[in-house]
Curated annotation (Swiss-Prot):
Alphabetized GO MF terms: mRNA binding; structural constituent of ribosome
KW Ribonucleoprotein (keyword) present: yes
Subunit structure: Part of the 50S ribosomal subunit.
Alphabetized PROSITE patterns for the sequence: RIBOSOMAL_L13
GO cellular component: cytosolic large ribosomal subunit
Database matches in HAMAP family: Ribosomal_uL13
NCBIfam families per the UniProt record, alphabetical: rplM_bact
Record protein name field: Large ribosomal subunit protein uL13
GO terms for biological process, alphabetical: negative regulation of translation; translation
Cystine pairings recorded for this chain: none
Protein family according to the UniProt entry: Belongs to the universal ribosomal protein uL13 family.
Function text: This protein is one of the early assembly proteins of the 50S ribosomal subunit, although it is not seen to bind rRNA by itself. It is important during the early stages of 50S assembly.
Amino acid sequence: MKSYLAKENEVQRKWYVIDVEGKPLGRAASQVATILRGKNKPTYTPNVDTGDYVIILNAEKVALTGKKLDQKMLRHHSLYPGGLKEISYKKALESKPEFVFQEAVRRMLPQGPLGRKMLKKLKVYRGSEHNQEAQKPEVLELRY
């Protein structure tokens, strides 16, 4: 019996649309990362991008549990001395909720060229409208 190795040109990709309104950020992001990687398919191969496309709606209404909304900080560094910039998740969700969700998913994907390729299949929208109707996405309900 031979092991199956997926090839890039043989992968059948689907489009999914997920509404994250009221869902915890980390739980939603982990399930989205699994779909983007293709780990939900029996044809998963670690070194090949076998994942599907995901459209996220209502990113501004994602939930953070406990006191994380006020206490947890979103940090990045400008690479200059003293260049650590930080903003609370409350302010970040008000100004750029798409970035907050995308960043949570990015940190759950592989760090490298394959991970960047997987992240390009993620489309995040602030409201409940998106412009990918031509792809006929399936509505996907998150497990928790």
